[in-house]
């Protein structure tokens, strides 16, 4: 959620940075409503001042011996009653304008950071670095992960359609074991890196989704329970960040670092026809998430370390990847700055996103009202929030099934996963 004060005091800069996203965002209605709000506040202040003045005059006159029912005092009392009536009429007007302003601000995305590249769409994203070129497989006949998975009997898409619908999968035997091994491996690595594990609810309320920015704009992307005001979590970012909603932390508590495994649920309403096969785009998938609640002064540094934590997982698995910095036109709604990690999928001869590491600055904190207090100082400030996939489990499995695929149709198990799977080969 953007700061109304920032919109009011720097309207041209705010509009310019919103325009760099490429959408249609207009702050003029907010400024107009704010002017009306200020006018009502001024009117209320004036009426309250006059009301206080009348009260003092009546008190003074009665104290000096005037009859409480004298014409002069009755005139003052009548005026006082009229003021009370006007103030009562102002209250709903002020509430309505405040609600309208809040709603319009809720509909605005975050401002791209000063260092985010300006661009229209993903074609103008900036490649930062690559890693693991030497690990790219040389086998020219690599099967797509869904084909090798079905041949090995570890991925079953057909029966998943029977049970649910398309974009679901059954993980069978070593497929289920590999999924579980990846989850445990990632959590173990993040815990060693200083994250505290959380296992949160995956049914979440609307306030939680508003807090992290999924509502109101992306309601159609989420699954909602029919009879309850609850939603299936699209990512662990939502429940974990909202652990601290409406709380005031001490600066000594920061940074707070959590990792969490959850199933994630997404309708993928805008992706019809994309990635219709395989594990890349499912309605239900598992993910390990990293979430940070940090001091604003440490925000940029914590973002870089978050990316490094995600990269460390890919490096340990020896999966080739590249780091992409998203341009302003490709940023997610809540992000001020974002790096995507893209893993190499040899069957498609391309890199595909496996982690998105975002710095939201105070955008989510304002929506979720997460603040902190500096020791010895008055008042509070909003924290900065960050999150990153560490990693998406299904996409990691897809990358392993392709990059570790052998000419004989087996798949080697990455060395770091062998203690979890108790085997060296999937066959």
From Swiss-Prot:
PANTHER family to which the protein is assigned, alphabetical: SERINE--TRNA LIGASE, SERYL-TRNA SYNTHETASE
SUPFAM superfamilies in the cross-refs: Class II aaRS and biotin synthetases, tRNA-binding arm
Record NCBIfam families: serS
Binding positions for L-serine per the UniProt entry: 235-237, 289, 389
Biased composition (Basic and acidic residues): 1-20
Subunit comment: Homodimer. The tRNA molecule binds across the dimer.
Location within or outside the cell: Cytoplasm
Intrachain S-S bonds: none
Pfam families the record matches: Seryl_tRNA_N, tRNA-synt_2b
Start and end residues of each stretch annotated as Disordered: 1-21
Residue numbers binding ATP: 266-268, 353-356
Coiled coil regions in record: none
Keywords attached to this entry: Aminoacyl-tRNA synthetase, ATP-binding, Cytoplasm, Ligase, Nucleotide-binding, Protein biosynthesis
Cell cycle listed as a keyword: no
GO annotations of cellular component type: cytoplasm
Entry text on domains: Consists of two distinct domains, a catalytic core and a N-terminal extension that is involved in tRNA binding.
GO biological process: selenocysteine biosynthetic process; seryl-tRNA aminoacylation
Protein family membership: Belongs to the class-II aminoacyl-tRNA synthetase family. Type-1 seryl-tRNA synthetase subfamily.
Enzyme Commission identifier(s): 6.1.1.11
Annotated protein name in UniProt: Serine--tRNA ligase
């Amino acid at each position: 959620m953007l700061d109304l004060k920032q919109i009011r005091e720097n309207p041209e800069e705010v509009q310019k940075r919103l325009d760099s996203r490429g959408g249609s965002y207009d702050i003029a209605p907010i400024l107009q409503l704010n002017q009306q709000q200020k006018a009502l506040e001024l009117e209320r202040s004036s009426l309250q001042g006059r009301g206080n003045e009348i009260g003092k005059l009546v008190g003074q006159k009665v104290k000096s011996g005037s009859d409480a029912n004298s014409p002069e005092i009755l005139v003052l009392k009548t005026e006082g009653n009229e003021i009370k009536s006007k103030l009562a009429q102002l209250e709903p007007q002020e509430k309505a304008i405040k609600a309208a302003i809040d709603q319009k601000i809720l509909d605005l995305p975050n401002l791209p950071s000063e260092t985010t590249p300006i661009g229209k769409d993903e074609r103008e994203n900036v490649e930062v670095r690559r890693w693991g070129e030497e690990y790219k497989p040389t086998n020219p006949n690599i099967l797509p992960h869904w084909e090798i998975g079905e041949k090995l009997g570890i991925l079953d898409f057909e029966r998943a359609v029977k049970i649910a619908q398309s974009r679901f999968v059954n993980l069978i035997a070593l497929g289920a074991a590999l999924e579980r091994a990846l989850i445990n491996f990632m959590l173990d690595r993040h815990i060693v890196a200083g994250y505290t594990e959380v296992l949160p609810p995956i049914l979440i309320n609307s306030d939680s989704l508003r807090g992290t920015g999924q509502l109101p704009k992306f309601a159609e992307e989420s699954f909602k329970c029919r009879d309850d005001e609850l939603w299936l979590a699209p990512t662990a970012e939502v429940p974990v960040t909202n652990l601290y909603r409406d709380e005031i932390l001490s600066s000594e508590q920061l940074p707070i670092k959590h990792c969490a495994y959850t199933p994630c649920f997404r309708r993928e309403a805008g992706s019809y026809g994309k990635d219709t096969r395989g594990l890349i785009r499912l309605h239900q998938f598992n993910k390990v998430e990293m979430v940070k609640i940090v001091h604003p002064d440490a925000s940029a540094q914590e973002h870089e370390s978050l990316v490094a934590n995600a990269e460390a997982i890919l490096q340990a698995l020896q999966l080739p990847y590249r780091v992409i910095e998203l341009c302003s036109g490709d940023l997610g709604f809540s992000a001020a700055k974002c790096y995507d990690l893209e893993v190499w999928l040899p069957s498609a001869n391309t890199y595909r996103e496996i982690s998105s590491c975002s710095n939201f600055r105070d955008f989510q904190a304002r929506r979720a009202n997460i603040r902190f207090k500096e020791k010895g100082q008055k008042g509070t400030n909003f924290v900065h929030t960050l999150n990153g996939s560490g990693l998406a489990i299904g996409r990691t499995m897809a990358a392993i099934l392709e990059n570790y695929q052998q000419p004989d149709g087996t798949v080697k198990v990455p060395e770091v996963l062998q203690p979890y799977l108790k085997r060296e080969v999937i066959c």
